[in-house]
Amino acid sequence: MLEKTAARQIGSCLMRCRTLDTTSPLWTGFSRLSTAPLIHEAREDGSLASQTLPYEAIPTTGRSAWFNLFQFWRKNSFQHMHLAMEENFQNLGPIYREKLGTHNSVNIMLPQDVARLFQSEGIFPRRMTMEAWSKHRELRNHKQGVFLLNGEAWRSDRIILNKEVLSLAGVKKFLPFLDEAAADFVTFMKKRMSKNTRGSLTVDLYADLFRFTLEASSYVLYGQRLGLLEEHPNADTLRFISAVETVLKTTLPLLYYPHQILQLFQTRLWNEHMHAWDVIFEQADRCIQNIYQEYCLGQERGYSGIMAELLLQAELPLDSIKANITELMAGGVDTTAMPLLFTLFELARNPSVQRELREEIRKAEAQNPNDLNQLLNSLPLLKGAIKETLRLYPVGITVQRHLIKDIVLHNYHIPAGTLVQVGLYPMGRSPLLFQDALRYDPARWLKREDTNFKALAFGFGSRQCIGRRIAETEITLFLMHMLKNFQIDTVSKDDIKTVFGFILMPEKPPLLTFRPI
């Protein structure tokens, strides 16, 4: 494992020790927790109420950052961080501190605490710093995109990008591209199915979903197809997918080990991470150069993707456009493929839900035969299914903010500058927050229940995921086309085991059977 190699190189001085078992069972609830609001602000003058407890009094997983990291390394707990976080909340309560190597944070999971966190974020919200990613941009002389930027530089770029990437008007323009890609995936599946004498297809869709998501997102970004749904896709695009997976795999340990030491000694972990980013930028640059040349030649055409629109607007410099398009391209593969895979699995083992969704799609199409946008707005249960998948299987297991001012949560003083993480995985599976929490029930999102700050898979506010609308629309159209054309089944009804590799993914992809309708 890359993490173990790096740990040996920088942590040989750490002593062997007894370690906690961090692979806890699924959430069983806090035995002593009340969900009553326990949120307070610091006084206007910055002073704290007399009963407020100091930051150091917050329950902690251990006071030695490197000792804690060694425990994680020794037990290979990086892959089970979501389960470790779940266990920590169960043992320590709704708020706790954690030190892991270079990483210090306060972790919370109750919606009222999350609300207070976001209320305090200001106009320049700051997420967790991805130092290895930023270092790559610096070493290769690449501009940073909005994922890595902060402050006014982030805000100015984000406002411009929102118009084409996140606004409803922008979605309407790229909606046909995603619909075409989703329909083509059905054709792709039917071709494979035609080679089976049984008239069905049993398959692990893991790799195929990566191909689809890159094909669809690139079509939206560049207005051109990559050919990933063809029988023999381009080798460079497959290398791109592999590079994205490598970036995710290597990012997790790089969050906790001193990247300066890894860089100095040119460790395997560091070099693989840097090389993977190089591959990503090379492929993105090939796509970008094609569009840029056509733009410079002044070829007239209709809407042809987000990058072309940004070039026409001329509000962002070219290097900023390249940086943000590359981030969107890299960020639109695994992060969309995994929710698709988990949703297909849950629908396969919940046939009644699958039937209800199929019927909703049939009725919506009958009522909106010529308006794709209105059709998508007529699928509340399908949108509930996507929320339900992301509740149980959040792509990222936390949402983070660096505090810009002191706040008080649960009578604990948390100073400005502290990294506060919202535990999405334990929140989504908590019986205190969701009735029958482990049951896949899309209809729960249609009921008149308080769901505020309980659906945060894409983040919140001005710093929510920039690719949110692309991902939501892509997932909705994909599921709509698949459910119209195929019955989805699985033999195994057991819960799927998950691992964390900077995003949540199945330990072993499920085997699914597709039958034409």
From Swiss-Prot:
Cofactor(s), by name: heme
Record-linked InterPro entries: CYP11_CYP27_families, Cyt_P450, Cyt_P450_CS, Cyt_P450_E_grp-I, Cyt_P450_sf
Record's keyword annotation contains Ubl conjugation: no
SUPFAM superfamilies, sorted: Cytochrome P450
Transit peptide (first-last residue): 1-45
Catalytic activity: a steroid + 2 reduced [adrenodoxin] + O2 + 2 H(+) = an 11beta-hydroxysteroid + 2 oxidized [adrenodoxin] + H2O
GO BP terms: C21-steroid hormone biosynthetic process; cellular response to peptide hormone stimulus; cholesterol metabolic process; cortisol metabolic process; glucocorticoid biosynthetic process
Signal peptide stretch: none
Residues given in the record as heme binding sites: C465
Keywords for this protein: Heme, Iron, Membrane, Metal-binding, Mitochondrion, Monooxygenase, Oxidoreductase, Steroidogenesis, Transit peptide
EC category: oxidoreductase
Disulfide bonds: none
UniProt-annotated location(s): Mitochondrion membrane
The enzyme's E.C. designation: 1.14.15.4
Annotated Gene Ontology cellular component terms: mitochondrial inner membrane
Example GO molecular function: iron ion binding
A family per Pfam: p450
Major localization class: mitochondrion
General function of this protein: Has 11 beta-hydroxylation, 18-hydroxylation activities and aldosterone synthetic activity. Catalyzes the final steps of glucocorticoid and mineralocorticoid biosynthesis.
Family note: Belongs to the cytochrome P450 family.
Name this protein carries in UniProt: Cytochrome P450 11B, mitochondrial
Organism (species): Aquarana catesbeiana
